[in-house]
Amino acid sequence: LKMLIDVSVTMVNGVFLPQGINEYINDVQHFNSVGDILRNYAFKAKMLTRHAGTHPPGAVMTLWLATRLFTYSDMVKAFLIIFSAPFTLIPMYLLARQLYDKKIATYTLVVYLVTPNIVMYTATCMDAFFSLFLITSTYLFFNSVERKSAVLAVLTGLSISLSMFMTFATTFLGVYFISLTTVTYLGNRKELKSHVTVLAISGGTFCLTYLIMYWV
């Protein structure tokens, strides 16, 4: 159902909003390789389109790889979002089920499918692609706290790192997780140790990931 909605919206937006779909995909031509993107993205930011010039390099790199595997076309971006956006429903359902129950999780999916801004931009805006990493990171954090798992905490850090590589909106997750830990200290100190441990491990993994990228 999600994919059918995305295809329908793409057909409409492809006619009425062609300029929106050109964001990011038009910037692929400015780079010759993945290494070029990693090394020179900041230096070339001023020559990129509005969104690409104010976002991390993840989206352009993803589209660069996609165009090498398939072809250079605006629709490559649309189909990338069409086929990836539905996967957002998986961590969203798991997160809602973990925090509440299966009934609420099902309602969450229904609301997601009929939310106007999500429906209208889900197949032409890269935010639909970014949301997969944001929601997955949130689910992994709560799952790590509940299971008290260091391995899941490391995966949380890696997921946040990947999410930050895609969008600066990931900064909110850090603020949210820190605020949540603070509230836990005030309201439920029995769970404080788990929150602090997961926060430290995931945060450390996040920082280490980018330090390694910088050194390499």
What are the roles of these predicted feature ranges?
Residues M120, L152-S179, L208:
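Membrane-interface alpha helices of multi-pass inner-membrane proteins
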Residues N117, T122-F130:
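Short acidic/glycine- and proline-prone juxtamembrane loop motifs at membrane-interface regions
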Residues S179-V183, G187-V216:
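Membrane-lumen/periplasm interface segments of specific transmembrane helices
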Residues T108-L113, I160:
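Short helix- or helix-capping micro-motifs
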Residues M75-L99, T136:
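Transmembrane-helix motifs of polytopic, lipid-linked glycan transferases
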